[in-house]
């Protein structure tokens, strides 16, 4: 993997890209979705694609360029064309075709079944060898409502899908917000730090993770860069990435347990503990530690599970004690945070009880009751 950025901002706008080099593939350009709103990105994406196949982005720059009426231009070129019926509809409902509507909220794409088979993507077990004839993309926002406009990045995504024809994989980083998924999250299959676009409805088919590829990526291909070295300082940005990596390990482990691959699940858990150690990256609900503990319990590794859940419970307990050290007025303001940590500790105690860690459960349940009763007593009348 190598990355490059233009240094002369006076000659051209800053350009970021990653080029993936493997075997005979030469350079395969990877598009930056967050930059897809920038006009120059489309032009540079084709100019600077090295030796990669650029036909995946065939839209001419004039459609996207500096023209302030890009959307109108796109509609005139793409949607109006020879479609007289649509043209009349827009004339009746719009003013000078300013587009108060999108004529459809669904796009249907014919699926090349042989290309899908050649692609190497996981075909959900529920389908057997049956691949759907068509892929339906419903244009909806993050709240499930029909979209009223398509932006440049979304048009780019749609065209990439249309032109790639499953001959090459198309991915989206797992850190991209759902508001930028163009309603296609039900076609994603996770292979690591990225979702792969598929022609399948992975939600309905219960096939959201390709455990084989994800296991290989996490266990054999990921490079962690020394975050396991004791005593190093990890800043906020790196810590967030560490949280993400621990979470995806728990997702993989959960899928492996579901598939009955317990040996691989245990190996993945132990590897995560080794490469993302708690002495540098403390256990936290936000980084999947609770799920790690539960997975260890499910695999019969109670000692390892107790270590994690004990640290989580102690953290929740310390927060509750600290909030109770405030005066009554301050505690009233912070009451929601106190209750939140109490709910975490309650969940942790219930997990201990579920897997028969009775001594540990009793230790924390007693303190939970005492602290919560103190909180209720102090907040009466507040």
Model-found features: residue ranges?
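ER/secretory pathway lumenal C-terminal domains and tails of membrane proteins involved
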Residues: 5-382
